[in-house]
Amino acid sequence: MILAVAALARPKTPGDQPGIAVGSAAPAIIGTTLDGAPFDLASLRGHPVIVNFWGPGCVPCRDEFPLFKQELAAHAADGLAVVGILMYDGPDDARAFIAHYGATWPTVGDPTGAIRTAYRVVGRPQSYFIDRNGILRKISVGQVTDSVFTDLYASISTP
């Protein structure tokens, strides 16, 4: 009995849960960016994409933001796209944070948690590396650092 309760209580990882799997098509993301523009992940087909679930109240999220800005510029010739999905924090705080860091990529609001649920997010930050064909290649739970970015990006950067 105790083992059954312990198994139910253990933390989930994205690979433990049905509905999303490395090697499968990434779930659709259709929504509105914080600046009011419509967004559809399908419009980025043909580009390597990083989908990052974040919020300005999350310290590791704040710490990885400069890395995403740096890598987006470094891989511009590859067509790299970054998409933020705002989790839990309010849009006004997120807009101020984005302006402070000079982030140029779109952030989509997820007020109902539908996107978070489709991606089986277990915490923030959490990043999904999607190849040019819309296939999920890697999932990173926790802060993406310089030391792991190269491997994660290599999984989606080949034509």
State the predicted function of each range.
Residues R62-Y101, P111-A118:
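Structural microenvironment flanking redox-active thiols in thiol-disulfide oxidoreductases
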Residues A96-A103, G109-T158:
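Thiol/disulfide oxidoreductase modules built on the thioredoxin-like
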